Amino acid sequence: MPIATVNNTQLYYEIHGEGEPAVCMGGWGTYCHKDGRGLARGLTDKYQVLVFDYRGIAQSRDDLNIPASMKLYAADLIALLDQLGWKEVHLIGLVGMGCGVAQEVALSRPDLVRSMVNMGCWASVDDYLRDQLELFRTVHREVGFYAFQQFVCIYSFLPEFYNQNKHRLLGPDGEWGELRDNYVTHERLVDACLGHNTSDRLRDITTPTLVIHAAKDMVTSPRTTLPIEYGIPGAEGVTMENTAHVVVGKAQKIEFCNILFSFLDKH
């Protein structure tokens, strides 16, 4: 179980597959501890993929005396990449948090980044997104993890999928399980998300960028993702018309993989 001491903390990480280096990051959770499940199908066949636990998640440690910010989580990744000797990495940020980390890495260390993918992203929070994120955190704190889990799942999945898969989405082994009995980390992740603001710096990103818009996303809709496409010089944008906050189901996953690999293959 690799654990790296970087940026005054300890990060758990895994590397799957072979090929050009890539990093895959999600939202308030982790792609680790799943034998590569959850990653885009075929990604580890073509790329050497790094996944890691954000500080405070699972086996990564955190220092609560350091204020949480997207720049802090980006500095963790930068230090990990430097320790591994990785450069010219494809950064794949999905479902919120990972996008902000990728943006900050692309801004501060463009030498590390070969391309960047953002989906479920924002450059800064408006009142609507701020209140959503605050409400998720408040429900967790005041009512408990399982109420939060149900609440966030209702916002993140389409009704048809939720109705058919509620038994898998909810419960101890359900979604966002990394935050169960871990409110403090959730609080800090939300702090980082609320404070994230690259609106005035997007023009400085020189990395080839793809922004994927999820037309039915009730959290990070095209309202928050389109400004990133428009703000980064030369960025490409693709809309998935039938997708909510999380890509689910065979058809959506195939569509997502086609979009992702079409972009990565060009860079």
Regions found by a protein language model. Give the residues of each.
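Flexible "cap/lid" loop of the alpha/beta hydrolase fold
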Residues: Q103-L107, R114-V143
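Short beta-strand/loop motif that positions the catalytic acidic residue
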Residues: I205, V211-H213
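Catalytic active-site module of serine/aspartate enzymes centered on a nucleophile-bearing elbow/loop
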Residues: A235-H267
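Acidic catalytic loop of the alpha/beta-hydrolase fold
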Residues: K216-T220
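Active-site loop/oxyanion-hole signature of alpha/beta-hydrolase fold enzymes
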Residues: L50-I92
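Short alpha-helix in the alpha/beta-hydrolase fold that links the catalytic acid
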Residues: T207, S221-Y230
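Conserved alpha/beta-hydrolase catalytic His-Asp/Glu region
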Residues: D127-L129, A147-H196, D200-R201
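Conserved HGGG/HGGXW glycine-rich cap/lid loop of the alpha/beta-hydrolase fold
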Residues: T5-D62
